[in-house]
């Protein structure tokens, strides 16, 4: 991985014209140890797609990567995970990677702790500039600046989003979002859900497909929302919540109708 794999750095204060959407998911095996439930991380899944402000997109490419070992210390860092996903994506797509990246999961509070950066909950949140919004983690205050590459010389900006907050009120589950996309979440038995390690050992291909599908739904739903949001507001971004779309539309209406947003009355 080198600078030549990425788009040129964007001039300061210039508009973003393309994003890399990196949907991700983690699979765990829960076990009871000394009356405490511990979660062993089994795998990370990712799905990458580039979206541009002209409405064009790349293909959606996906994959799976395992931690280095069974212990917490063996988990990947956020940097390592992003590098693995981007490297594999670029091998398949042969395009320059945008430096503005949306990292998207469904219920980030479950998936973000899978990175070694988050071993210490408080320090991890501070390091990744995360805010707790409706009991999940997103980046509100500022982007997460990450330096990729062997020499840490490739600057990218990460924005963390949670599709749970971007889902319709009566369609909050990942399965619901998959149905909206026409991309069904794969079915799994209760026994396998409670013993993901057993499923992983017994049927690796299905285990991989099950996890990767979840990350693909996150990516494709995010792309769909960015396009919809741009069509409605002419702003090229993925909002924090579905509610913020309505707020922006109201402000847009006020602007177009010369109304004062402070009191809803005509401007004089």
Model features per residue range: what roles?
Residues 32, 197-198, 202-268:
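Common nucleic-acid-contacting/processivity interface regions adjacent to the catalytic cores
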Residues 1-26:
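N-terminal accessory regions of nucleic-acid-interacting proteins
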Residues 13-17, 38-42, 95-98:
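Intrinsically disordered, low-complexity regulatory regions enriched in Ser/Pro/Gly/Thr
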Residues 27, 49-51, 106:
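Structured beta-strand/turn binding interfaces of compact recognition modules in eukaryotic regulators
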Residues 42-55:
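Short conserved beta-strand segments at catalytic cores or DNA/RNA-binding microdomains
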Residues 58-198, 209-213, 217, 224:
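Conserved DEDDh/DEDDy metal-dependent 3′-5′ exonuclease domain
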Residues 26-36:
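Short acidic, Gly/Ser-rich segments with clustered Asp/Glu that frequently serve as metal-coordination loops
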